Amino acid sequence: MKRTNYAGNITEEYLNQTVTVKGWVAKRRNLGGLIFIDLRDREGIVQIVVNPETAAADVAEAADKARNEFVLEVTGKVVERASKNDKIKTGGIEIEATAIEILSTSKTTPFEIKDDVEVLDDTRLKYRYLDLRRPEMLKNITMRHATTRSIREYLDGAGFIDVETPFLNKSTPEGARDYLVPSRVNKGEFYALPQSPQLMKQLLMTAGLDRYYQIVKCFRDEDLRGDRQPEFTQVDLETSFLSEEEIQDLTEELIAKVMKDVKGIDVTLPFPRMKYDDAMNFYGSDKPDTRFELLLTDLSALAKTIDFKVFQEAEVVKAIVVKDAADKYSRKSIDKLTEQAKQNGAKGLAWVKFEKGEFAGGVSKFLAESTDSFVNELKLTDNDLVLFVADSLDVANSALGALRLTIGKQQGLIDFRQFNFLWVIDWPMFEWSDEEERYMSAHHPFTLPTKETQAFLSADGHSKDSDLKKVRAHAYDIVLNGYELGGGSLRINTRQLQEEMLSALGFKLEDANEQFGFLLEALDYGFPPHGGLALGLDRFVMLLAGKDNIREVIAFPKNNKASDPMTQAPSIVAEKQLEELSIKLANKDQ
């Protein structure tokens, strides 16, 4: 029979009506002669009741045979439920079955299909099709759909055109590792899967499309963590003739619509703006979590006046004050914080407790004569804990920024119901790479540098003290609760400036033409001023759903080894396939 309703949508308005529902058995109970079946579909659960003494024989037999995860078709009359369940939408009714057909049977599942069950991550991924039956996972995936629907509605209404860009691209440097695809036709040559549609969307601007968007898969071969996957989805935008501020305003309106549509939350516009240097100096991060204070304080001038060699020889001395928490941190717990600081590059972690008007523990003996100065500078009150890092500016910021997040969680300083958006602006154009021993582009090499700092592009990029560090970019990141939600910039639209930028990054003209010749040539044909942004869809939905791993909002993700336990991808392929591609494998143990 044709399904008349989703099981989870049947309420009191259907009383005394005959309905047909189809779904999975979530639970079956035989109580005092009555058989109760909780039937589940994507919308929720409805209770089916069968009285074997009054029901038709085939109905009673099917109800008796049904087990968890059997697929059933049930027809029956909607009646008022004697014992109501206010926790579910259908809790006021049940269906008296007049017909039951078993559409499919099921083996015993490797884990219970319910939310409050502990299952190993790889087991969940191996049986992802079962994991997705759980109500929480269904909710996450439908929330993702609601998010993309809201995004499309806004962008379509704002005059954006959805354009697909190619997946088989040219491999270019200045990014993460590419996923390479060998060409059978052009032997010995490779395509690269796109890390983003960056260059293609810029070319669409010179093609005259003016406003482009795409919700698109991207690929990066990088080490994985909770908010990264080898394949991910981004909301990709590009516009012509808009200023940096206009692009930000447009993005804010888009996000405000999503927040209202998906979460029912009205967000305040415009979002706060924070300069990159302020984010690093006060939060120790270029993606600051502004839901709580615990700011970094630069104590360099004061700290270098005391007789403590570690402070005197450091480039900077910075600190955070954990208010009214000295008694909550034992030496053992401070040692754990010290290890975390070291993992973030610090040589160590100095500390003191302020108790009864004086410093105690840690480096207190070095601060004793300057107690009043430190108390005034840090605005200390009784039972405060002070943590210091003495190092280079970058290390001090990074180490204390990481500790700030850890302590914020430990001390319950974070309101997890909040959604704090902000823009991080005024970025440096380049960042130093110790591994490469040169400056690299902080975003990408197509970002427009500010007019005031373009003259520094001619500086040598192989010295950390180079004037390249003075170049600023028309770049902007949007941050939500300590996560980079997306990033964008105005782009270079003249060939001369683009060649200067590539030269600053160490490209010889010949190499620049080899890698980016198609873009450089396009810049000779009337390229409009343009800019854009990309939002991480997986990360956005993860935060909307209150999760801490994007796997929870992706239907079929990879594990931390970039593998799929369900399909066993990646896998060995047949020798014949490799021969067709002219590929010979080296010893994988080498």
From Swiss-Prot:
GO terms for biological process: aspartyl-tRNA aminoacylation. Its main location: cytoplasm. It catalyses: tRNA(Asp) + L-aspartate + ATP = L-aspartyl-tRNA(Asp) + AMP + diphosphate. Belongs to the class-II aminoacyl-tRNA synthetase family. Type 1 subfamily. It comes from Lactococcus lactis subsp. lactis (strain IL1403). Homodimer. This is Aspartate--tRNA ligase. Keywords: Aminoacyl-tRNA synthetase, ATP-binding, Cytoplasm, Ligase, Nucleotide-binding, Protein biosynthesis. The keyword Zinc-finger does not apply. GO terms for molecular function: aspartate-tRNA ligase activity; ATP binding; catalytic activity, acting on a protein; nucleic acid binding; transferase activity. Gene3D superfamilies: Bira Bifunctional Protein, Domain 2, GAD-like domain, Nucleic acid-binding proteins. Transmembrane segments: none annotated. L-aspartate binds at E174, R220, H443, R491. Its EC number is 6.1.1.12. Residues 198-201 are annotated as: Aspartate. InterPro entries: Aa-tRNA-synt_II, aa-tRNA-synth_II, aa-tRNA-synth_II/BPL/LPL, Asp-tRNA-ligase_1, Asp-tRNA-ligase_1_N, Asp/Asn-tRNA-synth_IIb, AspRS_core, GAD-like_sf. Catalyzes the attachment of L-aspartate to tRNA(Asp) in a two-step reaction: L-aspartate is first activated by ATP to form Asp-AMP and then transferred to the acceptor end of tRNA(Asp).
